[in-house]
Curated annotation (Swiss-Prot):
Belongs to the complex I subunit 5 family. This is NAD(P)H-quinone oxidoreductase subunit 5, chloroplastic. GO terms for molecular function: NADH dehydrogenase (ubiquinone) activity; quinone binding. NDH shuttles electrons from NAD(P)H:plastoquinone, via FMN and iron-sulfur (Fe-S) centers, to quinones in the photosynthetic chain and possibly in a chloroplast respiratory chain. The immediate electron acceptor for the enzyme in this species is believed to be plastoquinone. Couples the redox reaction to proton translocation, and thus conserves the redox energy in a proton gradient.
Length: 744
């Protein structure tokens, strides 16, 4: 066992040869390197698989022995300062390593087909392998300096991958936004690291925790300064994990390729903030009020992310806000001191969200056959619908991921989210009410995404992409399916079916119109597949290739079974709670005397309540988004109910308000753009003016004045000796007069 730990330092460096060799090959042998590009993808998967096997071996030893191994090398040693580098292997490291490698392997296999037609194929795999190296280095770091170094490398990789298609202005702006927003948090992280080093004199986690606990117990530190340093450390996690108020970069990060979105949202960048707080939790729990602040940020993010996801039309942005909300649950759990629940939800959410993003990538891939390569169209749920019969495997997989995120048993996220919800009652009833309500919102918006994408009819077939605006065959209501003015900000939730040119029918009309099958052929195919004797074209979406379906199906298995790792049933000598053994010892401020086991009655009571709330959200989504032309045959009762309802106008205003809030991202981006961006630009303009007119103006003015004085003197003198003598005696006379008055 000791020998296995001794070689653990190699974990972050195994994927590193791929980007180095790709860069060297493109520099020296570009033609040969590009012709063998599939070989580089195979090497990426192979090396990451070796890391996964190594991490699994470490995890098995962690479960059996609960040991912690740390090895350090001294780099700088003197009387006043010492700096060491090393690696730390503990349960948190092993969990994160398995998470990064398993999701990373699935994404790499998926990307081989997804990016096969892209000219940046090799660049993509180089970035991905470097991303894995950076994240693995982060989770194995033994001190704050290493954390910060790999933290910045993760940020650089995310910048490169979000802006992978940098020729698109939207993608270029998105990566800049992510980079700048994270710089705010990273600067706070750096200041926090320096602050705690100034307090304790150490960067190493073990020494840092021990020294700081002694200082706190002896009351030898300034609590206000310590709290400030802790908040600065937490600012790094706020930015990286897209917590309020530094969450604004996350939806724009969807401009990168879909496999990148899966990796960022499941196991790498956004998980880094959760990892940092979990790693520093022994430090935070002894600082007054910082845990309350962490839980407050978490609960705000939980609710804000859920409300912003309600009216998104872009399938990836809807999933992005879902990630933001779920990360809020993890941060809430850490703030409550429920270490196990937070990591449990990190694991289950990672696999479920990776499944959803890869499934959305499969949908986008199939939609591109109809609308061409245009993310605004291929990712727009307004143009989807009716994909069940075209992509049945993707549909089933996406449904399982959706139900998991909704908290439906026995899928993965049910077990972890339920644990956080139950712990929230012990911490704060107000936080608990918000968390449980958001669980219903989660079920609503996830079911909405599923219904708009897969149910009903294929809406893109009723659009005209010849460059002319054409009235669609029907419009789709309630924050997803709309008419021809898709980007109209004044769009309201008027639920109409537009028939022909002038005819209109109510959403609640009992007439069901049959769609002419001839209309399905009005779209010309945009994608043709060469390399065959005859050109094959598609007029319908089609299921993805096996290379893309294989990772999706593997993630389905994870979504089905990974939740059983943390089932807290330890009764009659049967120990099912593998996760608790894995995380021994762990921090739990809410159950200090508990052995992480509960009885069946208590569990079933809480589970029924949470499933009821989720089911209610699913029911509302089905009621609002289930296609009327395929479900409702007789709606006279609903029509009569709507006609006699005196509060319909008021309810429409509420719906429109919710829509505007979600569509405009809670007006937070607008606030930043209006006050921060404009203010900074005005400050920059003032600094430019001050620099040019004042700083440069003073020496330039002195030089210019000297020039004019010299010219005046030169013109007066004229080169005549009599003039020089006149000025000489004049100055001498003035000097003598001044001397006389000063001395007498």
């Amino acid at each position: 066992m000791e020998q296995t730990y001794q070689y653990a330092w190699i974990i972050p460096f195994l994927p590193l040869p791929v980007p180095m060799l790709i860069g060297l090959g493109l520099l020296l042998f570009p033609t040969a390197t590009k012709s063998l590009r599939r070989m580089w993808a195979f090497q990426s998967v192979l090396l990451l698989s070796i890391v996964m096997i190594f991490s699994m071996n470490l995890s098995i030893q962690q479960i059996n022995s609960s040991s912690v191994y740390q090895y350090v090398w001294s780099w700088i040693i003197n009387n006043d300062f010492s700096l060491e580098f090393g690696y730390l292997i503990d349960p948190l490291t092993s969990i994160m390593s398995i998470l990064i490698t398993t999701v990373g392997i699935m994404v790499l296999i998926y990307s081989d087909n997804y990016m096969s037609h892209d000219h940046g194929y090799l660049r993509f795999f180089a970035y991905m392998s470097f991303f894995s190296t950076s994240m693995l280095g982060l989770v194995t770091s033994s001190n704050l300096i290493q954390i910060y170094i790999f933290w910045e490398l993760v940020g650089i990789c995310s910048y490169l991958l979000i802006g992978f298609w940098f020729t698109r202005p939207v993608a270029a702006k998105a990566c800049q936004k992510a980079f700048v927003t994270n710089r705010v948090g990273d600067f706070g992280l750096l200041l926090g690291i320096l602050g705690f080093y100034w307090i304790t004199g150490s960067f190493e986690f073990r020494n840092l925790f021990q020294i700081f606990n002694n200082l706190i117990s002896n009351n030898e530190v300034n609590l206000l300064f310590v709290t400030l340093c802790a908040v600065l450390l937490f600012a790094g996690a706020i930015a990286k994990s897209a917590q309020f108020p530094l969450h604004v970069w996350l939806p724009d990060a969807m401009e990168g390729p879909t496999p990148i979105s899966a990796l960022i949202h499941a196991a790498t960048m956004v998980a880094a903030g959760i990892f940092l707080v979990a790693r520093l939790l022994p430090l935070f729990i002894v600082i007054p009020h910082i845990m309350n602040f962490i839980s407050l940020i978490g609960i705000i993010t939980v609710f804000l992310g859920a409300t912003l996801a309600l009216a998104q039309k872009d399938i990836k942005r809807g999933l992005a806000y879902s990630t933001m909300s779920q990360l809020g649950y993890m941060m809430l759990a850490l703030g409550m001191g429920s270490y196990r629940s937070a990591l449990f939800h990190l694991i289950t959410h990672a696999y479920s969200k990776a499944l959803l993003f890869l499934g959305s990538g499969s949908v986008i891939h199939s939609m591109e056959t109809l609308v061409g390569y245009c993310p605004k169209k291929s990712q727009n749920m307004v143009l989807m619908g009716g994909l069940t019969k075209h992509v049945p495997i993707t549909k089933t997989s996406f449904l399982l991921g959706t139900l998991s995120l909704c908290g439906i048993p026995p899928l993965a996220c049910f077990w972890s989210k339920d644990e956080i919800l139950n712990d929230s009652w012990l911490y704060s009833p107000i936080f608990a009410i918000i968390a449980w309500s958001t669980a219903g919102l989660t079920a609503f918006y996830m079911c909405r995404i599923y219904l708009l994408t897969f149910e009903g009819h294929l809406n893109v077939q009723f659009q005209n992409y010849s460059g002319k605006k054409n009235t669609p065959f029907y419009s789709i209501s309630l924050w997803g399916k709309e008419g021809s003015k898709i980007s109209n900000k004044n769009f309201r939730l008027v639920t109409l079916l537009k028939m022909k040119k002038n005819g209109r029918a109510s959403f609640f009309s009992n007439k069901v119109y049959k769609i002419d099958e001839n209309l399905r052929n009005i779209i010309q195919p945009f994608l043709s597949i060469p390399h065959f004797g005859t050109t094959k074209t598609y007029s319908y979406p089609y299921e993805s290739d096996n290379t893309m379906l294989f990772p999706i199906l593997i993630l389905v298995l994870f979504t089905l079974f990974v939740g059983f790792l943390g089932i807290p049933f330890n009764q009659d000598g049967v120990d099912l709670d593998i996760l608790s053994k894995w995380l021994t010892p762990s921090i739990n401020l809410l159950h200090k005397n508990s052995n992480n086991s509960i009885d069946w009655y208590e569990f079933c009571k809480d589970a029924v309540f949470s499933v009821t709330i989720s089911s209610f959200g699913i029911f509302i989504a089905f009621f609002l988004y289930k296609p009327v032309y395929s479900s409702f045959q007789n709606l006279d009762l609903i029509n009569s109910f709507v006609k006699i309802d005196p509060k319909r106008i008021f309810s429409d205003k509420i719906k429109n308000g919710i829509y505007d809030w979600s569509y405009n991202r809670g007006y937070i981006d607008a606030f930043y753009g209006t006050f921060l961006t404009v203010g900074i630009r005005k400050l920059a303009e003032f600094a430019h003016f001050f620099d040019r007119r004042i700083i440069d103006g003073i020496p330039n003015g002195v030089g210019l004045m000297s020039f004019f004085v010299a010219e005046v003197i030169k013109s007066v003198g004229g080169g005549r000796i009599s003039s020089y003598l006149f000025f000489y005696f004049s100055y001498v006379s003035i000097f003598l007069v001044i001397y006389y008055f000063l001395n007498f």
